[in-house]
UniProtKB/Swiss-Prot annotation:
This is RNA polymerase II subunit A C-terminal domain phosphatase SSU72. Its EC number is 3.1.3.16. The gene is SSU72. The keyword Hydrolase applies. GO terms for biological process: mRNA 3'-end processing; sno(s)RNA transcription; termination of RNA polymerase II transcription; termination of RNA polymerase II transcription, exosome-dependent; termination of RNA polymerase II transcription, poly(A)-coupled; transcription antitermination; transcription elongation by RNA polymerase II; transcription initiation at RNA polymerase II promoter. GO terms for cellular component: mRNA cleavage and polyadenylation specificity factor complex; nucleus. Keywords: Hydrolase, mRNA processing, Nucleus, Protein phosphatase.
Length: 206
């Protein structure tokens, strides 16, 4: 654990529906004392339904509490046994509703995506915004399988990476070295301990 977690650093976690992987990482980073937001890049929020061919689909912005109550009315037993109700209960304690990345106006220092298509969507969206602020953002993908167990494993690994980045920024400021010159070393060191979580990196701009 770092001696000082800088709450001025702005972190963001992103998955497809802003319900499982991004929200578990949101929770873990927030509990560690970091400034964190979370988003989804999908066209809608999709959660498993009562049959494989009929997922539950909601618009971004639909409160987690409303989704929870909808699933509760469909089948409390089914959605409790597959963990969806517990997941939504966690989510509604963190924020009101799933948010869509493409509608976000916040500016972040680091964006952690949880699968490659989300990484691509974030990078493409930032490129389309045109980089008018000339503010660098480090987009890092950590490939996490979309289930409860892997979301928990992935979130701990993301916290570890956030701590390493946090410490390196502090060290670079003391030594008057550009952080951008050091980030690949951090990612390489982190990846060597997490071979089961393939990562990607792209610097982008707001």
């Amino acid at each position: 654990m770092p001696s000082h977690r800088n709450s001025n650093l702005k972190f963001c976690t992103v998955c497809a529906s802003n319900n499982n992987r991004s929200m578990e990482s949101h929770k873990v980073l927030q509990e560690a004392g970091y400034n964190v937001s979370s988003y989804g890049t999908g066209s809608a929020v999709r959660l498993p339904g009562l049959s494989i061919d009929k997922p539950n689909v909601y618009s971004f912005g639909t409160p987690y509490n409303d989704i929870y109550n909808d699933l509760l009315s469909q089948s409390a037993d089914r959605y409790k046994s597959n963990g969806l109700l517990q997941m939504l209960d966690r989510n509604r304690r963190l924020k009101k509703a799933p948010e869509k990345w493409q509608e976000s106006t916040k500016v972040f220092d680091f964006v952690f995506t949880c699968e490659e298509r989300c990484f691509d969507a974030v990078c493409e969206d930032l490129m389309n915004r045109g980089g008018k602020l000339n503010k660098i953002v480090h987009v890092i993908n950590v490939d996490i399988k979309d289930d409860d167990e892997n979301a928990k494993i992935g979130s701990k690994a993301i916290l570890e990476l956030a701590d390493m980045l946090n410490d390196k920024i502090e060290q670079c400021e003391k030594d008057d070295i550009p952080f951008e010159d050091c980030i690949m070393d951090i990612l390489t060191e982190w990846q060597s301990s997490h071979s089961q979580l393939p990562s990607l990196y792209a610097p982008s701009y707001y």
